[in-house]
């Protein structure tokens, strides 16, 4: 099981949900990665699956990327505010509201007057 899978599953189960617990959890994870890097100077992330889980952009990385980078990637993956790619042709919220108003589907036109 990779570091990202372990940390994400712990975060989803509520072990690392509270702010203080989450920061201490990731600090311990970072320190563990730092010390394991000192014990083994070039860990191969490709064999553990950490680099593969990030998609095609991560395959450009060399196999000897540091564990600290893996932890930082893990933090980016597991954060609730991680950016989600949006399709370039997806309509914006303002555009959808404007088109709904132009078609007479605005909330004010749908309200029937009370007698």
From Swiss-Prot:
The keyword Manganese does not apply. Disulfide bonds: none annotated. Pathway: Secondary metabolite biosynthesis. It comes from the Eukaryota. Residues 42-62 are annotated as: Disordered. Keywords: Signal. Residues 1-38 form the signal peptide. The keyword Metal-binding does not apply. Induction: Expression is strongly induced under conditions of nitrogen starvation. Expression is positively regulated by the cluster-specific transcription factor rua1 that recognizes and binds to the specific 5'-T/G-G/T-C-G-C-A-T-A/T-C/T-C/T-G/A-3' upstream activating sequence found in all promoters of the UA biosynthesis genes. Part of the gene cluster that mediates the biosynthesis of the glycolipid biosurfactant ustilagic acid (UA). UA is a secreted cellobiose glycolipid that is toxic for many microorganisms and confers biocontrol activity to U.maydis. UA consists of 15,16-dihydroxypalmitic or 2,15,16-trihydroxypalmitic acid, which is O-glycosidically linked to cellobiose at its terminal hydroxyl group. In addition, the cellobiose moiety is acetylated and acylated with a short-chain hydroxy fatty acid. This is Ustilagic acid biosynthesis cluster protein orf3.
């Amino acid at each position: 099981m990779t570091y990202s899978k372990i940390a994400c599953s712990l975060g989803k189960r509520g072990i690392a949900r509270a702010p203080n617990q989450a920061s201490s959890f990731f600090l311990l994870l970072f320190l563990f990665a730092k010390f394991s890097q000192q014990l083994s100077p070039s860990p191969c992330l490709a064999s553990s699956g950490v680099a593969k889980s990030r998609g095609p952009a991560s395959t450009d990385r060399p196999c000897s990327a540091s564990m600290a980078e893996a932890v930082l990637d893990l933090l980016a993956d597991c954060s609730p505010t991680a950016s989600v790619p949006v399709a370039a042709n997806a309509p914006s919220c303002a555009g959808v509201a404007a088109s709904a108003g132009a078609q007479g589907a605005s909330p004010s036109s749908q309200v029937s007057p009370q007698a």
